Curated annotation (Swiss-Prot):
Record GO biological process: oxaloacetate metabolic process
Organism: Mycobacterium tuberculosis (strain ATCC 25618 / H37Rv)
Cofactor notes: Binds 1 Mg(2+) ion per subunit.
Record: residues binding substrate: R64, E112
Origin superkingdom: Bacteria
Chain's gene name: citE
Binding site for Mg(2+): E112, D138
Assigned keywords, A-Z: Lyase, Magnesium, Metal-binding
EC code: 4.1.-.-
Protein name per its UniProtKB record: Citrate lyase subunit beta-like protein
């Protein structure tokens, strides 16, 4: 599954609401069918049945199973065996061993605890891992805190630290980096600012909890027309240059060209000839 090419707008959808599956798939780049926190305990059997009975495109679908070591996870995996889905999201990931147990499935490790944050590099290095995500609210709860954000909406320092840790671990091992959800659905401006920052520092995805957030995220990740035009020009100029060179008043070297290639990739344009 080439999730890197899917796009930046991923959407959680409760797995016990199969009537929402098609709408979610139409709105999002990737749908995350949720068997964990989004489903009440009494509804989990129905959610597992819905996975089998209401299939989506497995190339654009991830299933969030329950945490490792739980009876619910074992039941989730049994249900998944009857589907075409090959990628799972592991919540509260805390070790490489938890990820390796899920092979041969591809795994997006969701880090939501202090132990998971400390072991992020180990988790990212595990062979089944294809992506790394972090979760702010569960993280703060496990730390004994009460709020992940300050009054102005900005993340508190510990949340920012874990966010950066996950991004670095994902990048170090060539995994997708997924930014946490923005819980305030009505705060479009806050989501836009957060998604722009995520794209600027190297996240591949901002995960959403409502279809209305998807276009905001896509717009935030897409470079402006001016930046795309610059990227095309500088890459064209680089073909006749060796090493670093001056271009439009700026010194250009390999990292600058990588930034330009990333812009075009996010816009869906090829960068090789």
């Amino acid at each position: 599954m080439n999730l890197r090419a899917a796009g930046p707008g991923w959407l959680f959808c409760p797995a016990d609401r199969p009537e929402r599956f098609a709408k979610a798939a139409a709105a999002a780049d990737v749908v995350i069918l949720d068997l964990e926190d989004g489903v009440a305990e009494a509804q989990k059997p129905a959610a597992r049945n819905a996975l089998r009975d209401t299939p989506l495109d497995p190339e654009r679908t991830v299933v969030r199973i329950n945490a490792g070591g739980t009876a619910d996870q074992a039941r989730d995996l049994e249900a998944l065996a009857g589907t075409a889905y090959t990628t799972v999201m592991l919540p509260k990931a805390e070790s490489a061993a938890q990820v390796i147990e899920l092979a041969p499935r591809d795994v997006i490790a969701l880090v939501e605890t202090a132990r998971g944050a400390v072991c992020a590099a180990e988790i990212a290095a595990a062979d089944p891992t294809v992506g790394m995500m972090w979760g702010a609210e569960d993280l703060i709860a496990t730390l004994g805190g009460s709020s992940s954000r300050r009054a102005d909406g900005a993340y508190r320092d510990v949340a920012r630290h874990v966010r950066s840790t996950i991004l670095l671990a994902a990048s170090a091992f060539g995994r997708l980096a997924l930014d946490a959800v923005h819980l305030d659905i009505l705060d479009v401006e806050g989501l836009q600012e957060e998604a722009r920052d995520a794209a600027a520092v190297g996240f591949d995805v901002t995960v959403c909890i409502h279809p209305s957030q998807i276009p905001v995220v896509r717009k935030a990740y897409r470079p402006s027309h001016e930046k795309l035009a610059w990227a095309r020009r500088v890459l064209a100029a680089s073909r006749s240059e060796r090493g670093a060179f001056a271009f439009e008043g700026q010194m250009v070297d390999s990292p600058v060209l990588t930034h330009a290639e990333t812009m075009l990739r996010r816009a869906g344009e090829a960068t090789s000839e």
